[in-house]
Design a protein with these regions (language model features):
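Extracellular/periplasmic helix-loop-helix junction of adjacent transmembrane segments
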Residues: 1-17
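MFS 12-TM fold signature
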Residues: 11, 39-46, 65, 130-134
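Conserved MFS/SLC helix-loop-helix module at the cytosolic interface between two early adjacent transmembrane helices
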Residues: 17-53
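Helix-breaking motifs and short loop linkers at transmembrane-helix boundaries and internal kinks
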Residues: 30, 51-57, 68, 85, ...
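Cytoplasmic helix-loop-helix junction between adjacent transmembrane helices
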Residues: 61-102
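Helix-loop-helix hairpin linking two adjacent transmembrane segments in secondary transporters
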Residues: 96, 100-146
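Flexible cytoplasmic inter-helical loops of multi-pass small-molecule transporters
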Residues: 143-167
C-alpha cells in the first residue's frame, strides 16, 4: 500500500543500505560534520513531510529523512567510543542507544497531541525544527574527538574486521 511504502520500504531500504557506506565514511572523515549535516538534512526533510502536497513529495521527503538518519548513527557511536575509555563504552553506548527509543515514545505521545490539536502537518513541522537547531549546535560546539584517544595498542583484526575490509 501507499502507507506501507512511506513508512516501511522507502525508508527502510535507504536507511539500511546507507549504513555501511556512511560507516566507512565516518572512519575517514570528520564525524562531527557528518552528524551535524545529517541531523540538519533529516530535520529539514521531516519538515518537508509537513508541507508536502502530493504523495510523491511526501515519499521523497521520507526517503530524505532516511538518508539523514542513516548518516547519524555510525558516526555518533564512533565519536562516543572515542570519548570514553573501553571499560565505560558499553554503558555509554547503551545509554546513547536508548535515545531513539525514548524519542519514539515521546514522539508518539506528543506528536499525537499536536496532530489532534493542530493537524498532522504541524507535527512534522514541530518535530523537524529543533533538529535544525541541534545540527547547528553540533557543528558549532561539538569537537571531533581524537580517534582512539582512550585505546591502547591495536589488536590484530578478527574475522569480522577481515570480512568487512573487503566492503
Amino acid at each position: 500500500t501507499m502507507m506501507g511504502l512511506l513508512t516501511g520500504l522507502a525508508f527502510g531500504l535507504l536507511y539500511a543500505g546507507l549504513g555501511v557506506p556512511v560507516g566507512k565514511l565516518a572512519d575517514r572523515a570528520n564525524r562531527r560534520n557528518i552528524v551535524a549535516v545529517c541531523c540538519t538534512v533529516w530535520s529539514l526533510a521531516t519538515m518537508a513531510c509537513g508541507v508536502a502536497q502530493h504523495f510523491w513529495q511526501l515519499l521523497i521527503a521520507r526517503m530524505t529523512v532516511a538518508v539523514g538518519e542513516a548518516g547519524g548513527m555510525a558516526p555518533s557511536i564512533s565519536m562516543v567510543s572515542d570519548m570514553y575509555p573501553r571499560r565505560q563504552r558499553s554503558l555509554v553506548i547503551s545509554l546513547f542507544m536508548m535515545g531513539p527509543h525514548f524519542g519514539v515514545l515521546i514522539g508518539l505521545a506528543v506528536g499525537g497531541w499536536i496532530a489532534q490539536h493542530h493537524g498532522w502537518r504541524a507535527a512534522f513541522l514541530w518535530f523537524g525544527a529543533p533538529g535544525i537547531v541541534l545540527g547547528l549546535l553540533v557543528w558549532l560546539f561539538v569537537r571531533e574527538p581524537v580517534r582512539g584517544g582512550f585505546d591502547g595498542p591495536a589488536e590484530p583484526p578478527g574475522a569480522a574486521a577481515a570480512a568487512t575490509e573487503s566492503l
